[in-house]
Amino acid sequence: MKLKEKMTQEIKALEQKKADADVAKKELMKIQVLSSRFTMEPEQDGKPQPVIRLVVKNNTDTVISRAYLHGVMASEGYSVPWLVSNFFYDIPEGLKPNEEATWAIAPPKNSEWGVLYAPKDAVLTVTPVRVDGTDNQALYDATMFTEEDNSRLEELKKKNL
């Protein structure tokens, strides 16, 4: 196979991967995070427990068994967020279509959440980036097309002109 053909095939594969990720992003918008809040709750051992509280609604037509989430804790007026973190939540019994649920996620005390001391005015924004179905396989995955994929696609397009 010639180099030009190989490059063309790789471009097509990367463009398809990008298109699939774009479809996933659109579908993931149907998973609404209605509210998100971060607190440090007192514990008997003296070290507070970080807790991420979310109210989530599933507006898809499929049961979701696990949600992969992207969280950003930031304050207005600051250009750098206090924390940017990816995390997941296994949903007991799944989140059914049109169902709304409140989740209390308790990250480990020694995680980045456990050492986070953001001011009271900091706001937690949470975005779903992938959800799995009851078969534990990805239903929608916006993370499949990476920055590296995008750079490679741009590089190949320049070379293939």
What are these language model-derived features?
Residues L3-R53, M144-N160:
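Low-complexity, acidic Ser/Thr/Pro/Gly-rich terminal tails and inter-domain linkers that flank the onset
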Residues V55-T60:
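Asparagine-centered strand-capping/turn motif at beta-strand->loop junctions
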Residues L83-L156, L161:
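Short, solvent-exposed, Trp/other aromatic-anchored flexible loops in extracytoplasmic proteins
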